[in-house]
């Protein structure tokens, strides 16, 4: 063994002796003052000391200062000659190669020493608290003193030598690495490696972005295609609704519109084709037409509302004994006129006699007129007499019609519309067209509209003058005279 190695071993043995004394004597004395069992309490003391040195900075500095004093006493070196910094360098230099000792600063040496001591204390405490060593430390201490301390010193020296070899290898590996010549080159190499990693991340993100954009484009095309199909279907449906609303047996337009989604009416392209105001007007007009068609359909089905033609479609020449309807009369009014005419014929009166008789007595009075009955029954009510008096001042409808005989209806209309010459021209044109149609000798055309219309019943009178209904009805009745059968 050379002198250098002997110097290193002496330093390691001094280091081991200090900490073995702490574990074997100092911590054992602290465990004796506790109430728990000595074994358990000694284990707590060992663990507490290890954690305190590692985690508590003040406890570590106190421990290092105590070790510095112990080292000076053992080596018999004056503390003035060996200061604290030299002490740290002496301990650390025994673990690292000499060629690196001068290149390492004092701060780095202090950090290396702290790591070495914490690691050493942790391993030594673990070895002492094993089942092999713990009984010899607690029991029969005097008999086992030399044996236990020797084993602890051997373990301490072996661990420190092993640690020295590890540090040597680290420094040798570092020496094999070619360091940059300057600090700038080192910074450049570090930034270059970091830049390469960033470029790799950028490439990955770019490829991911491209894939996402491709997926987005595909989804957008699908969406536009579906949207166009949807708008086309909605427009076709709306056109179908408009066509169906014009038919008589159409479903109400509002029912179809309610089934449509609200997005259909808020579509931009659809709003351009049909604005909102125009669409509302169209819908309102369609609804009005639908209601009008429905009302006309119901009116046409009613038997009391059959129209009576005003032109020469059925009756070619008016008859003296058969009334020709001049207004929109019903079948009931027509039958009543027939009955009145038959009664007059039965009693031997003709139409001329009835007219002459009516001229002498224009008003037929009853035995008790309505006014006299009202006055007789309401003598105590003077208000009703006043009402009748007021009524006398008002001409009746017959007088009004007599006054208006000199002014036909057309003249009244033309007189009322003097300020509108175009209206007068339209009325005159219509009148001329009617006169031209009457003067033309056109054949009688059966109106197909009246195929299912009511047909006048043919009356047959017996010898007593009473009429009886015939079971035969003519489908081509032309409004001629009624046949009287007295056979």
Swiss-Prot record:
Coiled coil stretches, renumbered: 196-235
Source taxon at top rank: Viruses
Gene source species: African swine fever virus (isolate Tick/South Africa/Pretoriuskop Pr4/1996) (ASFV)
Subcellular location: Host membrane
Biased composition (Polar residues): 294-305
Name of the molecule in the record: Uncharacterized protein B475L
Region described as Disordered: spans on this chain: 294-324
Keyword Transmembrane: yes
């Amino acid at each position: 063994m050379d002198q250098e190695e002997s110097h290193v071993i002496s330093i390691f043995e001094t280091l081991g002796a200090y900490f073995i004394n702490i574990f074997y004597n100092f911590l054992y004395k602290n465990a004796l003052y506790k109430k728990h069992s000595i074994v358990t309490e000694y284990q707590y003391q060992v663990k507490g000391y290890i954690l305190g040195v590692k985690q508590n900075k003040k406890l570590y500095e106190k421990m290092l200062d105590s070790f510095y004093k112990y080292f000076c006493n053992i080596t018999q070196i004056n503390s003035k000659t060996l200061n604290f910094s030299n002490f740290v360098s002496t301990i650390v230099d025994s673990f690292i190669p000499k060629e690196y000792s001068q290149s390492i600063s004092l701060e780095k040496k202090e950090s290396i020493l702290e790591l070495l001591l914490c690691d050493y204390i942790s391993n030594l405490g673990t070895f002492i608290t094993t089942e092999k060593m713990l009984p010899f430390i607690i029991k029969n201490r005097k008999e086992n003193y030399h044996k236990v301390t020797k084993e602890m010193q051997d373990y301490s020296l072996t661990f420190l030598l092993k640690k020295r070899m590890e540090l040597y290898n680290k420094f040798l590996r570092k020496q094999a690495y070619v360091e940059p010549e300057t600090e700038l080159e080192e910074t450049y190499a570090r930034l270059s490696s970091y830049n390469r990693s960033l470029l790799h991340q950028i490439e990955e993100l770019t490829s991911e972005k491209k894939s996402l954009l491709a997926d987005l484009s595909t989804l957008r095309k699908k969406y536009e295609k579906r949207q166009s199909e949807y708008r086309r279907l909605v427009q076709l449906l709306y056109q179908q609704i408009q066509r169906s609303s014009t038919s008589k047996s159409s479903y109400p337009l509002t029912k179809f519109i309610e089934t449509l989604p609200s997005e259909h009416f808020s579509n931009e392209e659809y709003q351009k084709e049909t604005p909102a105001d125009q669409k509302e007007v169209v819908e309102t007009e369609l609804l009005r037409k639908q209601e009008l068609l429905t009302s006309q359909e119901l009116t046409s089905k009613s038997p009391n509302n059959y129209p009576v033609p005003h032109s020469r479609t059925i009756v070619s020449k008016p008859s003296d004994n058969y009334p020709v309807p001049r207004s929109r009369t019903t079948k009931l009014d027509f039958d009543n006129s027939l009955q009145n005419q038959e009664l007059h014929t039965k009693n031997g009166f003709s139409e001329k006699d009835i007219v002459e008789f009516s001229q002498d007595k224009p008003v037929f009075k009853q035995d008790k007129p309505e006014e006299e009955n009202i006055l007789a029954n309401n003598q105590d009510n003077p208000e009703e007499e006043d009402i009748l008096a007021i009524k006398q001042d008002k001409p009746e409808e017959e007088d009004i019609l007599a006054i208006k005989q000199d002014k036909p209806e057309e003249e009244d209309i033309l007189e009322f519309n003097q300020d509108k010459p175009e209206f007068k021209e339209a009325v005159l044109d219509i009148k001329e067209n009617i006169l031209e149609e009457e003067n033309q000798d056109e054949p009688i055309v059966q109106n197909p509209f009246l195929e299912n219309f009511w047909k006048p019943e043919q009356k047959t009178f017996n010898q007593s003058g009473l009429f009886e209904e015939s079971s035969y009805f003519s489908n081509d009745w032309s409004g001629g005279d009624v046949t009287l059968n007295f056979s």
